[in-house]
Amino acid sequence: MKYRILSVSLLTGLSACQQAPSPAVLVDTSPETMAIVTSVLAAAVDRAQIELGPGDPAREPVITVLPPRPGPREGSSPAMPTHFDIVLMDGDCYVQERETGEMFFLTGIECRSASAD
């Protein structure tokens, strides 16, 4: 019984240290920064090359990865864009896949709270 109480206390203490993700925007959208973001997103959707949808990640906390273009023999494609939310958690910048909730760390990328606008 003591072990169970100690385990619950320890887990509660550890989870209290971690903040919930909050909406964020990128501080810098230079070509170098966007190249890093694009490579993280490409790995997240498991594609070598991606095209980002419209929007300004320095103003909006969302980045959209467009689906691959239909091939020459395809009339249309049922593929949908993949939406990622830019989030700040414990001072670090991540993109969170909206449908699955999976988080991807943006190494070396600086974000700020979206509510600071």
Q: Where is each model-derived feature located?
A:
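C-terminal motif of bacterial Sec signal peptides marking the signal peptidase cleavage site
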Residues: 13-16
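Second-shell loop/turn segments in exported
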Residues: 23-28, 83
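Bacterial signal peptide processing site
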Residues: 18-20
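Short linear proline/tyrosine/threonine-rich motifs used for host-factor recruitment
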Residues: 95-97
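Bacterial N-terminal signal peptides that target proteins for export
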Residues: 1-6
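C-terminal partner/receptor-binding element of secreted or periplasmic proteins
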Residues: 90, 99-117
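Mature extracytoplasmic domains of secretory-pathway proteins
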Residues: 31-92
